[in-house]
C-alpha cells in the first residue's frame, strides 16, 4: 500500500503543512490524524464545506456527488472523500470559489 505526501496550503488561514496519507485513507481523515483542522460538514461528498483545489498531483474522488464536471476539471476536490493517487499539493478553504 502506497503512502503519499499531502501538502496543504491556505494563505488566509496560515496553513502550510505536509503530512503522510495512505492511498486508502481520505485526505480529511489523514489531516485530522496529523492534528490539522480543516472545515467539513457532511463527510459524505454531498456538500462543499471541505472543498480544496489540487494544484499538483492527483486524487480519486469517485465517491463525491456535489462537484460538477467543470469544477472537477479545474482541480476542485472534496477532501472528505478524496484518496490520494500521488503526492499532492492542495489549496484549502476554497469553498467560496465554487460559487
Swiss-Prot record:
PROSITE patterns (alphabetical): 2FE2S_FER_1, 2FE2S_FER_2
Gene3D superfamilies: 3.10.20.30
Any single biological process term in GO: electron transport chain
Domain of life assignment: Eukaryota
Keywords associated with the record: 2Fe-2S, Chloroplast, Electron transport, Iron, Iron-sulfur, Metal-binding, Plastid, Transport
Coiled coil: none
Intracellular or extracellular location(s): Plastid, Chloroplast
GO molecular function, one term: metal ion binding
List of residues binding [2Fe-2S] cluster: 42, 47, 50, 80
Cofactor(s) needed: [2Fe-2S] cluster
UniProt domain 2Fe-2S ferredoxin-type: residue ranges: 4-96
Co-factor binding comment: Binds 1 [2Fe-2S] cluster.
Entry similarity comment: Belongs to the 2Fe2S plant-type ferredoxin family.
Role summary: Ferredoxins are iron-sulfur proteins that transfer electrons in a wide variety of metabolic reactions.
Assembly and oligomerization: Forms a complex with heterodimeric ferredoxin-thioredoxin reductase (FTR) and thioredoxin.
Protein name as catalogued: Ferredoxin
Species in which this protein is naturally found: Porphyra purpurea
Amino acid at each position: 500500500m502506497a503512502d503519499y505526501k499531502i501538502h496543504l496550503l491556505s494563505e488566509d488561514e496560515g496553513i502550510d503543512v505536509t503530512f503522510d496519507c495512505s492511498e486508502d485513507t481520505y485526505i480529511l481523515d489523514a489531516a485530522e490524524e496529523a492534528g490539522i483542522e480543516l472545515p467539513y460538514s457532511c463527510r459524505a461528498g454531498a456538500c462543499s464545506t471541505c472543498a480544496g483545489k489540487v494544484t499538483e498531483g492527483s486524487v480519486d474522488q469517485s465517491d463525491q456527488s456535489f462537484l460538477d464536471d467543470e469544477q472537477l476539471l479545474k482541480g476542485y476536490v472534496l477532501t472528505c472523500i478524496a484518496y490520494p493517487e500521488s503526492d499532492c499539493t492542495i489549496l484549502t478553504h476554497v469553498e467560496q470559489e465554487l460559487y
